[in-house]
Amino acid sequence: MSERKEGRGKGKGKKKDRGSRGKPGPAEGDPSPALPPRLKEMKSQESAAGSKLVLRCETSSEYSSLRFKWFKNGNELNRKNKPENIKIQKKPGKSELRINKASLADSGEYMCKVISKLGNDSASANITIVESNEFITGMPASTETAYVSSESPIRISVSTEGANTSSSTSTSTTGTSHLIKCAEKEKTFCVNGGECFTVKDLSNPSRYLCKCPNEFTGDRCQNYVMASFYMTSRRKRQETEKPLERKLDHSLVKESKAEELYQKRVLTITGICIALLVVGIMCVVAYCKTKKQRQKLHDRLRQSLRSERSNLVNIANGPHHPNPPPENVQLVNQYVSKNVISSEHIVEREVETSFSTSHYTSTAHHSTTVTQTPSHSWSNGHTESVISESNSVIMMSSVENSRHSSPAGGPRGRLHGLGGPRDNSFLRHARETPDSYRDSPHSERYVSAMTTPARMSPVDFHTPSSPKSPPSEMSPPVSSMTVSMPSVAVSPFVEEERPLLLVTPPRLREKKYDHHPQQLNSFHHNPAHQSTSLPPSPLRIVEDEEYETTQEYESVQEPVKKVTNSRRAKRTKPNGHIANRLEMDSNTSSVSSNSESETEDERVGEDTPFLGIQNPLAASLEVAPAFRLAESRTNPAGRFSTQEELQARLSSVIANQDPIAV
């Protein structure tokens, strides 16, 4: 029994075998339960440092009262000398050895031994612990022990394998071997950071093995290998691939941002273009509208200018009738010049006979058309005999009141009665008119009024007077104002058939009446008047005649002229007709009779709507038996002076003919 204990304590299997050798052999084949227990084979393990290892020791059959013991490199592992990371667990029929966080010191030979009443058995295994990322020596061949005895050989093969191992050693010995770290003195065997191990074998001397790093190889790790280059290249590839991926991602992000920015730019540019287009269209529309408005304004201005010009032309010329019918006579408004001729010029040149052309008002300018007989001669057969018999005829203009509306009076054309030169000095003042002078009523070719050549019409002839006029040019009393009427040949030109009628301005007429007491010389005794006088224009007596007018004219005051026989003839046109009234008064030449006649004529002028032809001597020239009562409204005169008999004969001839339609 002492030998068995020693054998257990030493852990040697030979003694066990020796002790069991004395038993009879037939016991092996006996199936009785008296046979000793048998352990299953344990496998050797190789593991990296820090890993967990488990060694199991099992019996092939179940036995009761079994005891297990573990040994490391021949030393029993108990509670005293057992490392902290090794634990032993006992279970029924088996035992386990657990190594937690294995290290290089845990490598070695481990043996399990079972003890029972029937017998003992043991099994062993090698454990190799290497550092991480290193290929360490392995034990690919397992050590087989079957009924281990001192006579049976045990073969252990140790080899180092790996891709970068510096050496591989295999030994075949009779006994067991294991790797142990070299001592401090022996560590210098391996160079370049190699790890030194010693292989201990019972029969052979120890040998050194080197565990080399990746960059070196050889028995002593003396050879340099570019192993780290591959690792670094991989790392570099990874490092380069990552930035590439990042760059790709960044480029994709940039592209997306660029696309968004491009789209935004396109949208902004499109919006700007649309806005500019809209603004341009608005500008074009506004320009067109303003242009149209300007054109309208220009057209209106032109129209107004044209209307003003036409008004001025109508004022100056009246309506144009280039070829008037022979039966119509056109009375045109008197031309008003912008440059008003001074009263002095008018007074100095008013010694000639003036023929009134139109009736002037202060508000309107209109023309009146009168009928004309188809005769183209100044006198027919009857009138020629009368004119030849008459030495002097007193005729006065009946449209002196037309000068009342114009303050200064327009310039007048002159026609020399004896074929002398015409005085056209006043044309200087009419050049600033809108139209040329040849279209004005003062021109020679334009006639403001026409009288029928076949019929003689008495016209008032009066001589204007002014303070500057010499006494020889002073107009005498009306009774002595006679002018010789030489026969005038008919001109082949229509323009010359229309003599220009001159009108005495109202202011000068008033002056003439003021200076009437001073005018004592007779007209036929004044040689200046006879040399410069006009041939008398036959103005017909307007009696009970119809006229046409566009609008009613304002009333014009008509002064009354004194006659030597103290007869005042008042001719009015109430309700568009001309009514002649002849009032016979006593012979008086006082100023009171003048004023009364002027006031009465002013009342009559207010009632006159249109051209009032006032001939104070016409009443004295008319004879009651010669008048046709159906065509005249004149009152017959009671008595006639001897000087008026000739004029009465003339008026009787004129009255027999058709009246002028005013």
From Swiss-Prot:
UniProt cross-references to Gene3D superfamilies, sorted A to Z: Immunoglobulins, Laminin
Keyword tRNA processing appears in the UniProt entry: no
Biased composition (Basic residues): 564-574
UniProt PTM: Proteolytic cleavage close to the plasma membrane on the external face leads to the release of the soluble growth factor form.
Tissue specificity statement from the Swiss-Prot or TrEMBL entry: Widely expressed. Most tissues contain isoform alpha2A and isoform alpha2B. Isoform Alpha2 and isoform beta2 are the predominant forms in mesenchymal and non-neuronal organs. Isoform Beta1 is enriched in brain and spinal cord, but not in muscle and heart. Isoform Alpha2C is highly expressed in spinal cord, moderately in lung, brain, ovary, and stomach, in low amounts in the kidney, skin and heart and not detected in the liver, spleen, and placenta.
Occurrences of domain Ig-like C2-type (ranges): 37-128
Ranges of the Cytoplasmic topological domain: 289-662
Pfam families: I-set (PF07679), Neuregulin (PF02158)
Example of a GO MF term: transcription coregulator activity
TM regions (residue ranges): 266-288
Residue runs in coiled coils: none
Residue ranges the record assigns to the propeptide: 1-13
Protein origin, superkingdom: Eukaryota
Family the UniProt entry places it in: Belongs to the neuregulin family.
Protein name: Pro-neuregulin-1, membrane-bound isoform
Organism from which the protein derives: Rattus norvegicus
Lineage: Eukaryota, Metazoa, Chordata, Craniata, Vertebrata
